């Protein structure tokens, strides 16, 4: 035998599973681009002064099986107590048909945000269903397709209230004293940067306060009390005060819709509809508002439109509100939402339907009534007479009760003076209620569930008659058909087939890093040890989570060159916001709070200026030179002009133009010279890992898109994770939390997310990726990502000019193809090429970002040479088709490009085009055919005729 045992053990086996091209394919591509090796190619492209001498020490790679075993041992340290803590988080029963066919299905979780609606009709339909659930339960006119979490939704509601308020001089926002504490925490953080004063008081005292533009009430208070705010809301509306109401989605099944009571905005968490607690997330928030406020709403909105043939089709509506277009004037900086989680909640509602949901809600309420009756029968007092699922129980021996609860492996809410909180949920059984009787009353309580049930069934007064819903919900056919598992399975599959995800083809979106989300990485997120923990459980019950998070943070520190990492931000946009707040608070700590100017290159992603605006900064744009790099002369001039008011610069590296700028260190030095901080956007970290690092380059803070570089899937538009890495001087200024002390962080800052560790339950994905790749694999992944991009650029540059290149004519991990000359010559646009790619079985590259009239391509390291060649061949074939238009063979108004994409129905319809059906749907011998279900969307029609609820089922099936 010539191989050693170590070689046969092959601990680095996963590296070859993750990286698409094998060694032979890599060498072929290296030959094609004129480089001898990966190291030689990297050496040519990356500036020498920022190349790391040694790779970060994150350990050797592990096999999939070894890594899973190691993580399972860590997860086993978590203690799975039954949690009745509530506070917006409850245990759930995720229907197995949804678990298997959506959450564990790459056809759903590997898709991208539906910017290309023709390849996204399935999840757009599921999101439209989510909006319909929201509309029915809230009683309002317009709903979004999810926000990041309930607390973030509250902050967005405050910001929206100010935007639509007619009280322009009012600057105070009132929050009822019984909202969830984590909600208040995030609202306060946002209010500080906007300059709003937050008033917290009993809701009935709101009218005592002057100069209030908006009010936040909670329909079911944090300790369980149901409020009838009808009269109060009417009085507030008479004073032109915008009213927002936080609501419990399961309670809304039984309770009066806040919209019917006059609320302007209603929001809450959809977690109870089938999404595990997961130590805090990810969870989708729902958000609804009156129709008159629709253009001021944050987040995605799915609308019903028409395609080119006049058929009903769905799309993301009113995108001109969003950050990628309006930049600092956007309604919100949100880029990622929580699509996968919203779709789970949506399908939970479809599967159970109105009858099933009412049964679940009534069962929860009945068990709560039984628990209340038994406790009161034995002399215990309840703080509130009206409740849905949560009791606030006064106890004389609170310490004894909590001790008995711990012995029974039960968590009660313990932060209420002289009382405990108990929140029941859909997993609660009669046996659980008997156990709670024993904890609160002792084992000899003598209570009987059936006897108590008869009592409360005939005389339940715990929901005020005026608060009981009197209208029907979820009457649309989609919520009343798919209740057998067979029907549900087929419905979900029919939606999946309409979409294009990574399980069918590469998604070469520039700046999005649509790499492999390996099965081994995904497996741990459904382990009950991770899925079932309450985010506010005692820390000793979450030792496994703490170990995993600490280890992941340590690896990220080493990979970024920073000194600390904060895991709280639950999206890249939230990470930007948190990082900028750290800079702001750092300056304030040095009595330099006047520093509020943020320099942003003209090429920046739209979230950058939107986040800067949210952080209370003024945006000053820095020009780029003819090569697409930051103009150093303009940078110096702008920095000098800002002077003592310079707060920071936000820069992406490699640049959004797909180039390693040679002067990046000089950029950092100029900003530091004038007292500013350097925020390095982590969007393109996939071209840095193992090769260089933000800290080594000279940056002070970055967010990391774990849903790009570190393999968390995009989920069709979320979830994401955007933890921030910081240098030591900024560490005291990262987000904290009002409920949970974050170990190792000395920060006293407010929170940016509802949960202390953001979407903690998806962090195992990134842990697994780093553990299986090791230092060697991570560097190689970056190098192959660079190789793949240069291979595409070199093969396509004669057909489609590459707009920007660096030294030696190379690109980084992505390249921009300039379509503008072709459009001038032929009239064929980047949009036509993008839609024609669908006929070839591909998702389009990023269109018109960062430069209008271009396509930005990022292949990632996970795509094999075979797939790259398939894409290249498709692009070259499209170029040949453009030449046919140029030569007059096909007219500009009727050719395969302007009519793309083509659908199956066209094959059997009358055919009057100057090209054949075969050219239309099987171009260049396409073998593995993806069939879109709609033709090109009519965007103008969709925005002019905004309709954001379910249409008759016959129209989109």
Swiss-Prot record:
Domain of life: Bacteria
Assembly notes: The glycine cleavage system is composed of four proteins: P, T, L and H.
Function comment: The glycine cleavage system catalyzes the degradation of glycine. The P protein binds the alpha-amino group of glycine through its pyridoxal phosphate cofactor; CO(2) is released and the remaining methylamine moiety is then transferred to the lipoamide cofactor of the H protein.
Catalytic activity, as annotated: N(6)-[(R)-lipoyl]-L-lysyl-[glycine-cleavage complex H protein] + glycine + H(+) = N(6)-[(R)-S(8)-aminomethyldihydrolipoyl]-L-lysyl-[glycine-cleavage complex H protein] + CO2
InterPro entries in the record: GcvP, GDC-P_C, GDC-P_N, GDC_P, PyrdxlP-dep_Trfase, PyrdxlP-dep_Trfase_major, PyrdxlP-dep_Trfase_small
Enzyme Commission number: 1.4.4.2
CDD domains the UniProt entry points to: GDC-P
GO biological process, one term: glycine decarboxylation via glycine cleavage system
This protein's name: Glycine dehydrogenase (decarboxylating)
One of the record's GO molecular function terms: glycine dehydrogenase (decarboxylating) activity
Top-level class of the enzyme under EC nomenclature: oxidoreductase
Keyword Metal-binding found: no
Underlying gene: gcvP
Any one Pfam family match given in the protein's UniProt record, by short name: GcvP2_C
Keyword tRNA processing part of the UniProt annotation: no
One GO CC term on file: cytosol
Homology family: Belongs to the GcvP family.
N6-(pyridoxal phosphate)lysine sites (modified residues): 708
Cofactor(s) in the UniProt record: pyridoxal 5'-phosphate
Annotated keywords: Oxidoreductase, Pyridoxal phosphate
Natural source organism: Escherichia coli O9:H4 (strain HS)
